């Protein structure tokens, strides 16, 4: 889990656009962020298994 201070720091508008970075909307994790869904890989997996992300299912080939 991300520290509360880091979540607040990221939410503020930065002076320069290159300083902005994405965080997971659920847990606040900055790495392995999936832009299309707005969550990190761990939260994405949990939501997909619960069926809360429409159109996503486990792949098999």
Curated annotation (Swiss-Prot):
Superkingdom to which the source organism belongs: Bacteria
Gene Ontology cellular component terms for the protein in this record: cytoplasm; small ribosomal subunit
Protein's UniProt keywords contain rRNA-binding: yes
Cofactors that this protein relies on: Zn(2+)
Sorted UniProt keywords: Metal-binding, Ribonucleoprotein, Ribosomal protein, RNA-binding, rRNA-binding, Zinc
Pfam families referenced in this protein's UniProt entry, alphabetically: Ribosomal_S14
Cofactor comment text: Binds 1 zinc ion per subunit.
One Gene Ontology MF term: zinc ion binding
UniProt binding sites for Zn(2+): 24, 27, 40, 43
GO BP terms, alphabetized: translation
Function of the molecule: Binds 16S rRNA, required for the assembly of 30S particles and may also be responsible for determining the conformation of the 16S rRNA at the A site.
HAMAP family linked: Ribosomal_uS14_2_B
Family named by the database record: Belongs to the universal ribosomal protein uS14 family. Zinc-binding uS14 subfamily.
Quaternary structure annotation from Swiss-Prot or TrEMBL: Part of the 30S ribosomal subunit. Contacts proteins S3 and S10.
Protein name, as recorded: Small ribosomal subunit protein uS14
Organism annotation: Alkaliphilus metalliredigens (strain QYMF)
Lineage: Bacteria, Bacillati, Bacillota, Clostridia, Peptostreptococcales
């Amino acid at each position: 889990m991300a520290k509360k201070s880091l979540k607040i720091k990221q939410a503020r508008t930065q002076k320069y656009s290159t300083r902005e970075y994405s965080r997971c909307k659920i847990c606040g994790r900055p790495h392995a962020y999936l832009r299309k869904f707005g969550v990190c890989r761990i939260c994405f997996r949990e939501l997909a298994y619960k069926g809360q992300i429409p159109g996503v299912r486990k792949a098999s080939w």
